[in-house]
Amino acid sequence: AAGVYSDHECSDMDDAMAKLRNGQFIMIRDGTAAHNLEALVDLLRQPYYDRCMFCTDDKHPSDLLEKGHIDYLIRKAIHYGIDPIVAVKTACHNPARYFALNNRGAIAPGYLADFAIIDNFDDFNVEMVFRKGVLTCSNGAVHDFEAPRIEDYLVERAHDTFHVAHLTAEDFHDARPRGVIGLVPG
């Protein structure tokens, strides 16, 4: 079946509830330009939170450095009184389920065992990172790790993909009129 399965543009509960009733997932957006978490925080309670996930949509690099990324939304949701487990599930499990990443988003048999250990739910500082169950980062230091192997067919698809005739400076000449914006009396 074709259709729109999610929305990241909701800015109020009425809009979000209408989309939930139509079967959509709600991506609760809180980035640099749009801040919708506070208005939509009640979605992170039963019976709705299983159909919600966090997204940033846009995030200025300085905001990433100062505030964080999805971890910032988790901390902010907890600040608004959301159960920390629900906040983490909204950041990890729900998006993995939505995007059909069936071996990610949880710590369980058959999953990849990609996870982070944090100090506490207030500060959310990462103390350790595990990838496929192997410690890859601790105490702020990245451990040696084997570079992932990229399948040959993916390498082939990424190379020799842009084919264009030889270009000259004349090819970039633009003869369209300039300064076309003006005032119309009236």
Predicted regions, residues:
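Glycine/alanine-rich phosphate-binding loops at beta-alpha junctions
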Residues: 1
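Active-site-adjacent C-terminal substructures of enzyme catalytic domains
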Residues: 4-104, 116-124
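Active-site microenvironment of metallo-dependent hydrolases
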Residues: 65-81, 85-186
